[in-house]
């Protein structure tokens, strides 16, 4: 079975079993909805967890799980990763992509590979920002906007970027 990583339990929140999830998923409001099932990776074994409450909080997503109604029951899971079955992702419109399809793609500028998309983070209401890991240089932050990201080929794991002048500083 294929698994899709959706986040990790960063910490507990309060005394009633609520946890802070650092999301690594598209559409966290949909992914962490009440009644949804996530799978916690406990020493290589996937433990099924059903969400009983969800609310966004700052950069985290606060969730409680069925059967874990106090801090003592859930605290041992801090730092563990959460997954969903890969077949539980829905089809997207043309020119929309899941994070897992973009992360790991080579970033190409003027025909030259400059690095690999290592992470994606959301901004409040604006475009996503891609983190390009560049060997021997600082990471480049690339806004996911049409004028910068020219081409995406998820099958070839390749994205073509035309950076705005000054966006990529090679003087590291």
Swiss-Prot record:
Disulfide bonds: none annotated. Keywords: Chaperone, Cytoplasm, Ribosome biogenesis, rRNA processing. InterPro entries: PRC_barrel-like_sf, PRC_RimM, RimM, RimM_N, RimM_N_sf, Transl_B-barrel_sf. Its main location: cytoplasm. GO terms for molecular function: ribosome binding. HAMAP family: Ribosome_mat_RimM. Binds ribosomal protein uS19. This is Ribosome maturation factor RimM. It comes from Exiguobacterium sp. (strain ATCC BAA-1283 / AT1b).
